[in-house]
Amino acid sequence: MQHAYDEHLATNRYFDRKFGLEAAKILPGEYYVANQEALLVTVLGSCVAACIRDADSGIGGMNHFMLPDDGGRDKVGMSARYGTYAMEVLINHLLKLGARRNRFEAKVFGGGAVLASLASSNVGARNAEFVLDFLKTEKIPVVAKDLLDSYPRKVYYFPYSGKVLVKKLHRVHNDTLFSRENDYKVRLSGAPMDGDIELFI
């Protein structure tokens, strides 16, 4: 059965020769889950990624999102609903694969101040604050984090083992990251947030 939120599942899958694993590249607004050995990869600027796994079974996943700019008007309202949706979609899919919520652990990354167009809204810091607050509220322990600062990061997540490799990109040789995040920001500003999502128990 297909769910409405399946449209956010990453579709860019490939075989990573360096690590010898099936891999998924997660773009802004997407997520991916795995119940076997796999590699999840993303590049983060102002966005954040939550890597959540069942520490016993190795079922895990990663999302990649940012809160829409609300101009500082709506700290816990509409803007936070986008982040909550991104987190709950990931958690629901993990539970659907058989993960147990009481065995979840999280690692979080991103929230850098890397886009000049987003600097005034401090969106990276808002994203980082949101993801930490969400996980605290949901009682999911954060076992590792690399947040804020002024550079992009490339994150390699191996959900089965929980291992993460983070490459800090002090030099970005093209504007792909920046254009992806700007495009995502534009999509967020025009997208209605209808309805709620219920947690799969």
Swiss-Prot record:
It catalyses: L-glutaminyl-[protein] + H2O = L-glutamyl-[protein] + NH4(+). GO terms for molecular function: protein-glutamine glutaminase activity. It comes from the Bacteria. Its EC number is 3.5.1.44. Keywords: Chemotaxis, Hydrolase. Signal peptide: none annotated. One of its GO terms (biological process) is chemotaxis. InterPro entries: CheD-like_sf, Chemorcpt_Glu_NH3ase_CheD, Cytotoxic_necrot_fac-like_cat. The keyword Coiled coil does not apply. Transmembrane segments: none annotated. SUPFAM superfamilies: CNF1/YfiH-like putative cysteine hydrolases. Probably deamidates glutamine residues to glutamate on methyl-accepting chemotaxis receptors (MCPs), playing an important role in chemotaxis. This is Probable chemoreceptor glutamine deamidase CheD 1. It comes from Dechloromonas aromatica (strain RCB). The gene is cheD1.
